[in-house]
């Protein structure tokens, strides 16, 4: 399953995604699903907003099956095309924990504007499980924070 690609990530169930994005009356999100053989193999959530004279597009969330060659490329190109057609001058996203995707974003001329340290604390977990967690397999996007507006 797609969610098993990471040690730690938000559970992206249908109920959660509807609560987080589609049932929000205060913000308009654009949701895209990607299929292969009639099965969802990825999705992305976009938002646009105006700040001063700039219209920005945010790729709020992107989740995909890493085993499908070029799926991430297709998602990002499709998202950029959609945002461009909707008059966005800049595109931003946060992506923590997927180095392959970050490398591909660099090839698409995205650049790192700032970084945020990943800080974690063990609460109720066996020590051996905690030691086996790999910070590079903690997956976070802009949609996993409270900072989206």
Regions inferred by a protein language model and the residue ranges of each:
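Amide-forming acyltransferase catalytic core, primarily the GNAT-like/NAT-type
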Residues: 1-58
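Active-site/acyl-donor-binding loops of N-acyltransferases
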Residues: 30, 36, 45-70, 74-149
């Amino acid at each position: 399953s797609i969610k098993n690609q990471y040690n730690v990530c938000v559970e992206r169930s249908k109920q959660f995604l509807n609560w987080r994005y589609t049932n929000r009356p205060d913000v308009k999100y654009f949701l895209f699903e990607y299929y292969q053989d009639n099965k969802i193999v990825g999705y992305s959530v976009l938002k646009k907003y105006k700040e001063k004279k700039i219209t920005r597009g945010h790729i709020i969330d992107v989740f995909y099956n890493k085993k499908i060659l070029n799926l991430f490329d297709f998602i990002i190109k499709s998202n950029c095309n959609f945002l461009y057609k909707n008059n966005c001058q800049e595109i931003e996203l946060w992506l923590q924990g997927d180095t392959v995707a970050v490398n591909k974003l660099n090839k698409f001329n995205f650049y790192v504007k700032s970084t945020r340290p990943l800080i974690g604390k063990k609460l109720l977990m066996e020590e051996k499980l905690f030691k086996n967690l790999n910070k590079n397999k903690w997956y976070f996007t802009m949609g996993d924070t409270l900072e989206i507006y």
